[in-house]
Amino acid sequence: MTKFSVVVAGGGSTFTPGIVLMLLANQDRFPLRALKFYDNDGARQEVIAEACKVILKEKAPDIAFSYTTDPEVAFSDVDFVMAHIRVGKYPMRELDEKIPLRHGVVGQETCGPGGIAYGMRSIGGVLELVDYMEKYSPNAWMLNYSNPAAIVAEATRRLRPNAKILNICDMPIGIESRMAQIVGLQDRKQMRVRYYGLNHWWSAISRSFRKG
């Protein structure tokens, strides 16, 4: 089976170890030969990367692991880019959420005025990653789940229409799982769900139970 090389852009994120564990849990379907982290904050990334190095050494020592702040090193010889960046980091997220609340409107990182502000900041950073990928590994695909997903997806569609990029969000799956728990089911797949809305702002969920 073909083994893949992946770079996680946003390697300094506290969510990155979860991505590593997810990748390791799916080695039977998506085997890795190499895993790299990339971040423009070297100090922050080092803390996360050293922790992940321990995980990989214990669970998958055959996977080559490295981390860097150099785009050429990070994006060369990769098959997939997994991008989850937060432009402005948590200090700006705090402003995105608190400023709208002072004016009596939704204060949320992907919705309302804060979501628009965060989206405008995110576009440039995500496009930069797309350009690095296309320059150093033109055959690679990007899985982008940098928020706000809808704004970023539309920006990449308009500004990089030929880029090999999938913009995704796991919030609908998370909501389905919580709903399944509420109604006493063991798994969200025991429901048939129709989801209306975008990512963190959904208007309705309808469900029907499977027979048997």
Swiss-Prot record:
Which amino acids does the record list as binding NAD(+)?
4-70
- Name its GO BP terms in alphabetical order: carbohydrate metabolic process
MF (Gene Ontology)? hydrolase activity, hydrolyzing O-glycosyl compounds; metal ion binding; oxidoreductase activity, acting on the CH-OH group of donors, NAD or NADP as acceptor
Q: Which UniProt keywords apply?
A: Manganese, Metal-binding, NAD
Q: Name one Pfam family in it.
A: Glyco_hydro_4
* Residue numbers binding Mn(2+): C169, H200
The family database entries (SUPFAM superfamilies) matched by this protein are listed as:
LDH C-terminal domain-like, NAD(P)-binding Rossmann-fold domains
Gene3D superfamilies, alphabetized: AglA-like glucosidase (3.90.1820.10)
Q: Note on file?
A: The GlvG polypeptide of 212 residues cross-reacts with antibodies prepared against the full-length 6-phospho-alpha-D-glucosidase (MalH) from Fusobacterium mortiferum. This operon may be cryptic in wild-type K12 strains.
The family line of this record is: Belongs to the glycosyl hydrolase 4 family.
The protein, known as: Putative inactive 6-phospho-alpha-glucosidase
| Species this chain originates from | Escherichia coli (strain K12)
Q: What is the lineage of its organism?
A: Bacteria, Pseudomonadati, Pseudomonadota, Gammaproteobacteria, Enterobacterales
